[in-house]
């Protein structure tokens, strides 16, 4: 949909320390003429430098959608949101990452009619999870030929999914002497050849 505001409506000024900032409205004085409804809440700076929100808007408006059908098996649904363009016109890249490092990857061209969907399987079989490692699948859709205002190889859509793959947690094995517990009246005693703790079950004190 239409975005308001597109651009921050400010003028470049310097503060008392000489630092530059984009000024608007009351920045020019309490009684300075101002419409009162213009401010810096756009998607780009007054000099057209993009804000981080630009990436979010691009994602929301992209014409290719991705859904996880069975992420553990690498099965995803790709939807062509175009109304008149077949998705085979574009290249779909996929990468499997382990802690940000690509361990598998490839690219395909899928024949998906406008407003249609198709399932695609990323080869994650045989992936052995390592302790402390997160696994993700990244998708990127790029142009294969120049279009008006868009060069070849430009990314028109992207997405990322975490794979529900985790290594079994290693069982902690203590390397100290074995502990033994005994109870004597109101006292619980935990001891080994190196330590001796006495817990008073009434007061909670430890000696």
PLM regions: where:
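Extended substrate-binding grooves/exosites of carbohydrate-active enzymes
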Residues: 2-77, 82-88, 93-102
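Surface-exposed coil/turn segments at beta-strand junctions on protein surfaces, enriched
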Residues: 69-71, 85, 113-117, 130-132, ...
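Buried hydrophobic-core signal for structured, non-transmembrane domains
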Residues: 75-82, 122, 137-141, 194
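Intrinsically disordered, low-complexity Pro/Gly/Ser/Thr-rich segments with frequent PxxP/GP/PP motifs
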Residues: 90-92, 97-141, 149-151
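Short amphipathic beta-strand/extended segments with alternating polar/hydrophobic composition
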Residues: 106-109, 151-152, 160, 193, ...
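Beta-strand-rich N-terminal accessory domains
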Residues: 138, 143, 167-207
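Short beta-strand elements
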Residues: 146-174
